[in-house]
Regions:
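Interdomain/boundary linker segments immediately adjacent to catalytic/signaling cores
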Residues: 1-69
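N-terminal "first-domain core" detector
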Residues: 65-66, 76-77, 88-92
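Active-site beta-strand-loop-beta-strand hairpin of nuclease catalytic cores
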Residues: 88, 92-105
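Short, well-structured beta-strand/strand-turn elements
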Residues: 73-85
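Extended, charged low-complexity segments
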Residues: 197-289
Length: 289
C-alpha cells in the first residue's frame, strides 16, 4: 500500500456518496433536524450530522486499510460473514489465515465505551469466538484491537474478560492498542509510523469543515443525488417543516441543484417522476422566488 491508495480508501468511505446519505437520513429521521427546542440552526445541525457520519465512516475505512495491509503481507482474507446456530448472521471485522492458524479481529477505532457498551462488545466478541472455535479448534486465534492508542478506558476490563475466555475456550486471545498490533503481531513497527505520517498528511489536505451547501457545486451534487430512492424524495417533499424551518434551504442555498433535479425528473417516464417534478416545481417557486 502506498499513500495514494491509503487516501483513496479513506476518501471512498468517508466522503463518497455523503450528499445522498445525508438526504436519506433527513428523509427517514426528520425529527433529528427540525424543532424549536434545538439550540442549533439548521446549517449547524446538518454540519454536526455530517461530522458524526465521518467519525463512523472512519472506522469502516480503517477496517479496509488493515485488510489491505494483511493482504500485502501475504495473509489470505476469508469471508467475514459467519452464521450462528439459529441462522442469524454475524459480521467479522477481520478474518484471515496464514495457512496454519485462523485469525479473527474485533477492530474498533477507540476504547472509550461506557459500561453497557463494553459489556455488549465482549458479548459480541464471545459470540464470534464460539462459532469460530467450533470450526477451527486450537488453530484459532482471536484479537481485540483498538487503533487509537490514546483511548484505553476499559483496558483492565478487557484484559480480565479475555483471560476468562482464553481459559474457557482454550484459544489464544490478545488485546492490542495502536502500535502494539503492528509491533507484536505483524512485526512491522515501521509500518505503524508510516500510517501515522499518512494520516497526518491526509488530514492536512482536508478543509477545516465539510461543505453543507450542495449548490456550491450544483452539477456534481445533482449527479450524486439524482439516484436517491423515490421514497426518500417523496418524504422530503411532503414534509413542509423541513422547508419552513430552513433545513432544505441550508442544503440548497440558491436552488440551482433543485432546478437540475426538476428538469431531470420532468424528462423521465412514469407517474412517480412526474409527481416529484411537480412537487419540486412548487417548492422552487415557493422558497426560491
Amino acid at each position: 500500500m502506498n499513500y495514494q491508495e491509503f487516501c483513496k480508501i479513506l476518501n471512498k468511505h468517508i466522503f463518497e456518496g455523503e450528499r445522498k446519505e445525508l438526504l436519506r437520513r433527513i428523509a427517514e429521521n426528520p425529527e433529528r433536524f427540525i424543532g424549536l427546542f434545538r439550540p442549533t440552526k439548521p446549517g449547524a445541525k446538518i454540519l454536526q450530522n455530517l461530522l458524526q457520519s465521518h467519525e463512523i465512516r472512519m472506522g469502516e475505512a480503517l477496517e479496509e486499510i488493515i485488510e489491505e495491509i494483511l493482504k500485502d503481507l501475504g495473509f489470505e482474507i476469508l469471508s467475514k460473514s459467519i452464521e450462528k446456530e439459529n441462522g442469524e448472521m454475524l459480521s467479522l471485522d477481520q478474518y484471515f489465515t496464514d495457512g496454519e492458524v485462523y485469525f479473527f479481529i474485533e477492530q474498533k477505532v477507540r476504547d472509550d465505551h461506557d459500561s453497557s457498551k463494553k459489556r455488549g462488545q465482549m458479548s459480541n466478541f464471545e459470540a464470534k469466538l464460539e462459532i469460530l472455535s467450533k470450526k477451527h479448534g486450537s488453530k484459532l486465534s482471536g484479537i481485540m484491537y483498538f487503533i487509537d492508542p490514546d483511548f484505553s478506558k476499559n483496558k483492565n476490563y478487557y484484559i480480565q474478560e479475555l483471560e476468562k475466555l482464553k481459559n474457557f475456550y482454550g484459544i489464544e486471545l490478545n488485546l492490542y492498542y495502536g502500535k502494539e498490533f503492528f509491533e507484536h503481531f505483524l512485526n512491522k513497527p515501521d509500518l505503524w509510523e508510516k500510517i501515522l505520517d499518512w494520516l497526518k498528511q491526509w488530514k492536512d489536505s482536508l478543509p477545516e469543515l465539510p461543505e453543507v451547501n450542495f449548490d456550491a457545486k450544483p452539477k456534481e451534487s445533482f449527479e450524486e443525488i439524482k439516484t436517491l430512492e423515490l421514497r426518500s424524495w417523496r418524504k422530503i417533499l411532503d414534509n413542509d417543516k423541513l422547508w419552513d424551518e430552513g433545513v432544505m434551504r441550508a442544503i440548497f442555498r440558491d436552488g440551482s441543484t433543485l432546478k437540475l433535479l426538476h428538469s431531470y425528473f420532468n424528462g423521465l417516464e412514469g407517474k412517480p417522476y412526474k409527481e416529484l417534478a411537480n412537487g419540486l416545481n412548487k417548492k422552487i417557486n415557493e422558497y426560491y422566488p
